Amino acid sequence: MSSSNEPPRKTDQPSSSSASASASPSLFLSLPLEIISMILARVPKRYYPILCSVSKNMRSLVRSPEIHKARSLLGKDYLYIGFIDENYRPVYDYWYTLRRIENSTTENLFESIEFPYPSEPNRFSMNAVGPKIFFISESCTPSSRLSIFDTRFGELRQGPCLLVKRGYNCVGLVGGKVYVIGGYQDDEIAAESFDLNTQTWEAAPIPDEKESHRWICKANVSFDRKVCALRSREGMTCYDTRDGSCQRSEMPNDQWSRVGLCVIDNVLFVYFSRFGLMWYDSKLMLWRVVYGFDLDNARSVGIGEYYGKLAFIWEKPSLNVSESKEIWCRMIGLLRSEVGIHGAAEPSQLVEIVPNGYRMCHCLSLSG
């Protein structure tokens, strides 16, 4: 998401790695923009929040269109979109990926893919961590198992077990760590974190929210160094990973789905049935409408970050193929100004025709 108050500078910005960028940003920022863009495009996106904290100029660069264009040419970002077919029992999952065609900055490919699941029959939360998907138990049967699927190589492996068995919980990625809150017994560790570098679990700050049911959520997201549990009626509860403090806020009285929300440049976006696309102003603790375009009251919507834009995916009945429906996609550019966030919608694209029984259940943003 770009900002009208902080345009990227053509020269004067970061170094050939995230470490050197932090150590001597002025030297890095003096390089030509084209070189800076290609360097930063190769840095894993989970380090971008760290780079953004170096300086305002660095933050503008990391969020600039030039970086997203460079990442696009490298094919760094992609979406994993999952459907379940409700016409059959047991229910089966069908997965597709949306990714850029090689050496293109605009054309996308939507194709069916094989997707392995952990053998344990529990229900799992699925969380995108760079190019990997973390499976953590999310059911009434507590489990300490962690499974990790690497989308680059199609490999599913077992990760280190959690410190305690957990049932329903809230999961989020903040600052190089995966946090798990809730789903514990009274005498157990209330929250823990998994360090992506050391590959180890450790106890995290104890949440001051004493009601453990607050972490039984419809969806979870991470922004502002917080992990947030979203519930339809109870609103949003956010856990601050720095000190365990928790904050509650209301959500609009409208319908939304767990696939219809995402975070872009540290801003939470949710698509509501009546209100449309909205964003959460964390400073004012208000929900605000994204203006500037019309989504025609789309239903069964999934959204995700895709090269700095919001990928908007929805279903509608097929007029040409009986007992089928169409999957459509359009990209929405986001511009933040002093008055709010405006969206610029690109042309819609029909990407697939699927059976009527398919229902979108996952929309994961992954990155290399």
Swiss-Prot record:
SMART domains: FBOX (SM00256). SUPFAM superfamilies: F-box domain (SSF81383), Kelch motif (SSF117281). Keywords: Kelch repeat. It comes from the Eukaryota. Kelch repeats lie at residues 177-221. Residues 1-23 are annotated as: Disordered. Pfam families: F-box (PF00646), Kelch_FKB95 (PF25210). The keyword Oxidoreductase does not apply. InterPro entries: F-box-like_dom_sf, F-box/kelch-repeat_ARATH, F-box_dom, Kelch-typ_b-propeller. Residues 14-23 have a biased composition (Low complexity). The keyword Nucleotide-binding does not apply. Residues 25-71 form the F-box domain. PANTHER family: F-BOX DOMAIN-CONTAINING PROTEIN (PTHR24414:SF75), F-BOX/KELCH-REPEAT PROTEIN SKIP4 (PTHR24414). This is F-box/kelch-repeat protein At2g44700. The lineage of its organism: Eukaryota, Viridiplantae, Streptophyta, Embryophyta, Tracheophyta.
